[in-house]
């Protein structure tokens, strides 16, 4: 996608969301709030980070987060792109030009008491360079960050970059392991997607830790 197309698309999407502020979120564990300067692709530098404190030594905590967010993000895409006839207001819609040249119409779907809830979901999904390049639900946000020596799973979405055409770097541990999520369409005639989660070490040796199929 050219820079010109990107700017045009970015402008269209910016009309759909009220701001770059993340939604209020009440964590179950500890939280951290920080101010970020020069946040890429945002118009508001006062972006608040809220996250859940994780046990650095617990591999299962990282793995559970990955699978949980896969399900959450995939569900969000289906929710936003589905025709909710009982809740859609046809007068409240926005024509969106997709990166591949197609045009679609986004309707406001009342999924909560506040429109802000919907707008934030739209921002989370569409304000992502990976989505803009390939328009696929196969992505995760920046999952982890470290503040004052403590590891947090982030709720503000600064997006991870793809390692190759199909993979996204999730997290690199101190001892060198990293988690990769690869999304593979099972069948061109269906919307089924197989997410393969694998763990790599510093020698690029890997093991598949799970396969999650969604449709």
Spans of features found by a protein language model:
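Surface-exposed, charged secondary-structure patches
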Residues: 141-188
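Core segments of small alpha/beta cavity-forming domains
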Residues: 51-148
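Intrinsic-disorder/low-complexity regions
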Residues: 4, 28, 37-45, 176, ...
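Short beta-strand edge/turn micro-motifs at domain boundaries
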Residues: 20-28, 190-215
């Amino acid at each position: 996608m050219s820079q010109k197309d990107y700017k045009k698309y970015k402008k269209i999407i910016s009309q759909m969301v009220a701001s770059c502020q993340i939604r209020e979120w009440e964590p179950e564990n500890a939280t951290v709030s920080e101010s970020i300067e020069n946040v890429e692709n945002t118009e508001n530098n006062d972006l608040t980070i809220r996250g859940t404190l994780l046990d650095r030594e617990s591999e299962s905590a990282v793995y559970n987060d990955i699978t949980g967010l896969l399900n959450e993000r995939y569900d969000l895409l289906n929710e936003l792109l589905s025709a909710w006839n009982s809740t859609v207001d046809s007068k409240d819609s926005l024509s969106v030009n997709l990166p591949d040249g197609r045009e679609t119409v986004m309707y406001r779907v009342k999924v909560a008491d506040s429109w802000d809830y919907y707008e934030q979901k739209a921002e989370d999904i569409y304000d992502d360079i990976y989505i803009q390049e390939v328009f696929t639900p196969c992505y995760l946000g920046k999952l982890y960050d470290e503040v004052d020596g403590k590891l947090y799973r982030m709720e503000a979405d600064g997006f991870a970059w793809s390692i190759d055409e199909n993979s996204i770097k999730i997290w690199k541990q101190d001892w060198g392991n990293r988690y990769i999520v690869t999304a593979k369409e099972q069948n061109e005639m269906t919307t089924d997607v197989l997410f393969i989660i694998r763990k790599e070490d510093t020698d690029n040796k890997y093991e598949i830790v799970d396969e999650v199929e969604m449709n």
